[in-house]
Amino acid sequence: MLPVYAPPLASLAAYLLGSVPFAMISSRLFGLADPRSYGSGNPGATNVLRSGNKKAALVTLIGDALKGWAAVFVAQKMGFSDNVIGLVALAVFFGHLFPVFLKFKGGKGVATAAGVLLALDPLLGLAVLGTWLFVALAFRYSSLAAVLAAAPAPVYQVQMHGGNGQTLVVGVLALA
């Protein structure tokens, strides 16, 4: 049995992990300007891609997705309840949206949400990613693809598993 203080500590750790700004890190590694200074001003993979450096954008995308996946995966392996895993999932996601290290002005959370969904339920994550890919290829707009992929995520969750605690987490991710 885990100690009573483990869930709040896990949630705090997940929030701090979510706050790690991979767009800033990859931009520095590749000698690029601060991604908040161009394009949409958003510290995310799509805006880093606007710099013209696909490798930096890919590093950002992978880093942002991995932090979402890792937080949930570790919480699962530690034996936390589904409710605590849901809190950890939301904490890492909101850490990306409102990072303490960037004065609470973060990215849109698309890659981090994808990582969270892949860890919570790989089939659900793949369904959402498939929807995103289809829309992105059809319309060539990442933001439109994100909205149209997130919207049916709770429906996919209910179709696959019925309504459960994860449905609430998936719904919050979709609405954010």
Please report, for each region that a protein language model flagged, where it lies by residue.
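Loop-to-transmembrane alpha-helix initiation sites
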Residues: 126, 142-150, 163-174
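N-terminal signal-anchor transmembrane alpha helix
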Residues: 5-30
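Interfacial segments of multi-pass membrane proteins
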Residues: 49-52, 75-78, 110-139, 151-161
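Cytosolic, membrane-interface loops and tails of multi-pass inner-membrane proteins
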Residues: 24-56
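C-terminal ends of transmembrane helices
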Residues: 23-26, 46-47, 95-105, 132-139
